[in-house]
Swiss-Prot record:
It comes from Thermobifida fusca (strain YX). It catalyses: (R)-pantoate + beta-alanine + ATP = (R)-pantothenate + AMP + diphosphate + H(+). InterPro entries: Cyt_trans-like, Pantoate_ligase, Pantoate_ligase_C, Rossmann-like_a/b/a_fold. GO terms for cellular component: cytosol. The reaction proceeds by a bi uni uni bi ping pong mechanism. Belongs to the pantothenate synthetase family. Homodimer. Coiled coil: none annotated. This is Pantothenate synthetase.
Amino acid sequence: MTQSTASAHKTPVVTRTAEEIQALRPQLGRLALVPTMGALHTGHRSLIAQAREHAESVAVSIFVNPLQFGPNEDYDRYPRTFDHDLRVCAEEGVDVVFAPTVDVMYPDADGDSLGQIVTVDPGSMGRVLEGEFRPGFFHGVLTVVNKLFNLIRPDVAVFGQKDAQQLAVVRRMVRDLCLPVTIVAAPTVRDPDGLATSSRNVYLSAEERASALALSKALFAGADAASSGPAAVLAAARAILSEAARATPPVSVDYLALVDPTTFTEVGDDYRGDAVLAVAAWVGETRLIDNVPLTL
């Protein structure tokens, strides 16, 4: 399957087991993988388009990974829309979809015994920001990504800048474990109102969505202040988030941080160079994350 034969609205091959995807792999040539949890949206379409630029064939994995959800998180209600996802993949000319069950990905674990399986430790980078507020999250992410790499054997994998810390942690895993995969970052896709596309946006009511726009507004305000240094960036963003905390419904911030894009350590006021301004917040029962890259 070559780039020239890829066409929109073709039906991708659906594989569900390790044996099926591995039997197909020799036919795929240079392969780019887009790992997803399904509920595909315009952001995922952008990732698929980016993947197409780097390989002959494109694979999309669809797997809601229980290992990256905490005990009080939204694993059970996370959107599962396989028929819709398959239509999106067909429209985008995806060659193969890998949609395993939990039993395929974690054959010796069920329910509570998930905690007994061997996982990939994310190191110190995976214990700050998202790792602090969602303990075990990056263990789950890196473990499933590593398993997908081993099963599918892609040459390239595409991740969104919208999940900037995840992108950085995956890059570190690939480097430290000498994995033969090139990681490509795709820019964040936003809806016309500025909200970063996310599968969790479907949880938001109209009023909650209006409040949630404070996240992107805060980030853009911070980016506009970048020439004045880190303190000005954070002050500009905090001003908007403080106002949003008094809105109806309110925005409740988990963190706002200005970090080094490689290590995700917070930068000091004398820092100059590339950085990421990242935010996580709750609007109603929905937790959203967003970020913008900037140069100080």
